[in-house]
Amino acid sequence: ANQVYTKFEMIKTIDKVGTSDGVFRKYQDNLLTYSKDGISAYDKDGKQLWNQTYEMQEPIVVSRGGHVAVADYKGGVLYLIGPSGNATTVETNLPILDLDVSSSGIAVAALQDDATIYLRMFSATGDVISEIKTSMQKSGYPLAFSISPDNIKVGVSYLKAEGGKINTSLAFYNFGDVGQNETDNLVSGYDYAGELFPLLF
């Protein structure tokens, strides 16, 4: 049988945080909110933990653990934010298409240089660790990608349009010892005709 509730008890209230046009997302056991003007983290009581301002048209925000990576779609600046709110600003000099970050703060960004795509890996302090160069003609458009918890493996979903049909190629790169002897660190790949993989985890 269905239960019917006729009253409630208010246990706790907090003031609204963020902006009216902000996007809200879970951030560990806290709250992350961002907009075109900046990004902030709040605890359960609504107390601001940290804040980073910027100016973006279409912010891309990814978080894992206490680490956050933020960039404007097709912009050239990447923000790497640690658990305490300390931020590193990275000038990529190329438009950013997508990005991901690991729980230890290692970030990977897909950068576009005309028809050439670079998958560039950054340390939490913004140093370039590694880079893979590919092309849209060879691999396709990087639709989504994800970095492994050990910061070594990266999976990429490439979108290809061939003969009026949409196909997806999944490529898996290894930046560790296993991938050192492979061309472009590519250790495996799979093609899926007529399939679309917009997300990777």
Predicted regions and their residues:
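Extracytoplasmic/luminal low-complexity segments enriched in Pro/Gly and acidic/polar residues
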Residues: 161-201
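Structured, soluble extracytoplasmic/luminal domains of envelope-associated proteins
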Residues: 41-103, 198
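Structural motif
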Residues: 38-40, 76-80, 115-121, 162-174
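Residue-level marker for isolated small/hydroxyl-bearing positions within beta-strands
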Residues: 34, 71, 109-112, 156-157
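Hydrophobic beta-strand positions that form the internal "hydrophobic ladder"
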Residues: 31, 68, 106-108, 151-154
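Beta-strand-rich domains and repeat architectures in extracellular enzymes and scaffolds
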Residues: 8-40, 44, 51-62
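A short beta-strand motif characteristic of beta-propeller blades
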Residues: 3-16, 45-53, 84-91, 128-135, ...
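Repeated scaffold domains used in trafficking and secretory/extracellular systems
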Residues: 16-26, 55-66, 94-105, 138-146, ...
